[in-house]
Amino acid sequence: MVLIVFGLVVLRGFEQGDIKPLFLATPTPTRTFNSYAQEGEVHFKVGNLKKAIESYQMATTLDPNNADLWAELARIQVYSSAMKSTDAEKLAALQAGLASADKAVEVAPGSSNAHAFRAFVLDWNANPSLVGAEEAQKMLTRAEQEALAALQIDPANGLAMAFYAEISTDQLKMDQAQRYIAMAMEAAPEQMDVHRIQGYVWETLRQYSLAIQEYKLAVDIMPNMTFIYISIGKIYRHLQLWPQAMDYFAKAASINQQIGVNDPIPYLALANTYTQQGFFREASMNMQKALSLDPGNPDVYAQLGIVYQRARNYEGAIPAFECALRGCDAVKSCEVRMCDDANNPAITLPGLPLSDNTVVYYYTYGSVLSGLHKQGDNYCVQAVQVFDEIRAKYGDDEAIMRIVNVGMDICGNT
């Protein structure tokens, strides 16, 4: 009788969960949002923005009402857009950042930081080449309103001051920009963003030495922010200080290699720098390296076409432009990439649409086709198609139309 009662007690214990069966596997600890947030912060500081985004996305899944997590995710998503080379990729990153910033304000409308980061995100989204001039102006106005809301909630918010300075710079309100970035430097000199924006203000004012100085301070704080190295290199290139420019582009490439990021942008920057100096062999080598890192990116094929055109390798430029602008199959893309096996990997490309950022590729492609035209080929047929597309969208742009008209004249069309 005692054994029966004992058995019933044990059975009830199993059913209620008070008694656990022997030899159960040790339960795996459940990760907290804070664990993912800390991981994301580390990835961001290291410079691996892709992994940082993934970690913060996990953190927001576990704690969806944490405005700070959404704001930080938005910040990183927007900065990741600086490491994209196509309009579509940039826009996708910026729109993802805007969705995260909107969520931050939604869950914490009284948070100064939430409004500050939303201002920053709106400003970066206000790119006329991506969203059109009218929409860009609307976004700039909204960005200004968000920055003012952040400062109304917390007048001492240094990041809000800095973001307002960046917005003011994009509005060409330079006196206001200088005033607010000076305030930000006093309030938050430890922030990478503050020095980056001070550098941007100086660069806009063509104070290039001061801009470089501030950008360098920004990477002193966060040494693996490769897009800032690219900004420094571009200023040196503008000043025709070629060794310094290439040094900073090479540093960006080296950092990416160390942290395992396959980013073609440093190699594209190196290639363009070599092209400007007339070193086309070195430029082509760097373009091919960029292609090996991102073989599915049509913008890289287009930039390779530009290098070939500048080097007067017109026969090489045509297939590169064709892949970039019209799309191509795995065999054609392999030909452009100079690979051994079209199926390893098998890369098919969509064409880049005509836009403010790609029109230079289109008219260069058309010019190469018309310039190589010989009786009996169809190069002029293709060239006229390209020029007609350009004319339909940019017929009022005199500079572009001068180039188009030269090509049309060659092909006997006016």
Where is each model-derived feature located?
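Structural marker of alpha-solenoid helical repeat scaffolds
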Residues: 62, 107, 153, 187, ...
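Alpha-helical segment of the N-proximal tetratricopeptide repeat
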Residues: 31-62, 79-90, 159, 163
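Register position in tetratricopeptide repeats
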Residues: 45, 79-80, 124-125, 170-171, ...
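Residue-level recognition of tetratricopeptide repeat
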Residues: 41, 75, 79-82, 120, ...
